[in-house]
């Protein structure tokens, strides 16, 4: 078992494991923890009372964070002709069609988000095994399969985050950097959490969010009271 660093252990000691924190309290606690020499990413994980094997309980969506993500995403676009030109003009980092599909199939993964025009999905579909597990597969529900490539690229570059519940019912998302103000982080967290709640499947009975944690890159997860979300 790997040994944790002194800073990690110090951070862990500050967390009361018998307590469930509000999101605001968890964020404040994170910001009080020992500093590192880089700007950590802040993340949340929500455990949902859903069965992702059922199509009507596969919770997924996207949100434009009110205060951005703190990083500029590298966007890859699958498009041809005029739409490829439009994508480049809109700020896409990598644009291509069949050759790019082949490149990704062979292991190229130097990008953060993927957009595709509908006519490319016949070819892009075979990348499911590569892109799917990484949460990168384009999907109309998240606005990443579209003819409006300009809007999709601008949204992603402007701080859009996609989320999807995994096979175990966990839904994770990034919502900023530790250097953000506590208020900005809370606003970002609430924006995603509110959208997740809005997407609650009608067939789910009882409590929807059953467990939650907030953490940052180098710090342990802080337990959050689902009732406070």
From Swiss-Prot:
Functional note: Binds directly to 23S rRNA. The L1 stalk is quite mobile in the ribosome, and is involved in E site tRNA release.
Pfam families: Ribosomal_L1
UniProt-listed GO biological process terms: regulation of translation; translation
Subunit record text: Part of the 50S ribosomal subunit.
Alphabetized InterPro entries for the sequence: Ribosom_uL1_bac-type (IPR005878), Ribosomal_uL1 (IPR002143), Ribosomal_uL1-like (IPR023674), Ribosomal_uL1/biogenesis (IPR028364), Ribosomal_uL1_3-a/b-sand (IPR016095), Ribosomal_uL1_CS (IPR023673)
Alphabetical list of HAMAP family matching this protein: Ribosomal_uL1_B
Cellular component annotations (GO), alphabetically ordered: large ribosomal subunit
Protein name: Large ribosomal subunit protein uL1
Top-level division of the source organism's lineage: Bacteria
Keywords: Repressor, Ribonucleoprotein, Ribosomal protein, RNA-binding, rRNA-binding, Translation regulation, tRNA-binding
GO-annotated molecular function: rRNA binding; structural constituent of ribosome; tRNA binding
NCBIfam families, alphabetized: rplA_bact
Gene name, Swiss-Prot/TrEMBL: rplA
Source organism: Bifidobacterium animalis subsp. lactis (strain AD011)
PANTHER family named among the record's database cross-references: 54S RIBOSOMAL PROTEIN L1, MITOCHONDRIAL (PTHR36427), LARGE RIBOSOMAL SUBUNIT PROTEIN UL1M (PTHR36427:SF3)
Similarity comment: Belongs to the universal ribosomal protein uL1 family.
Gene3D superfamilies associated with the record: 3.30.190.20, 3.40.50.790
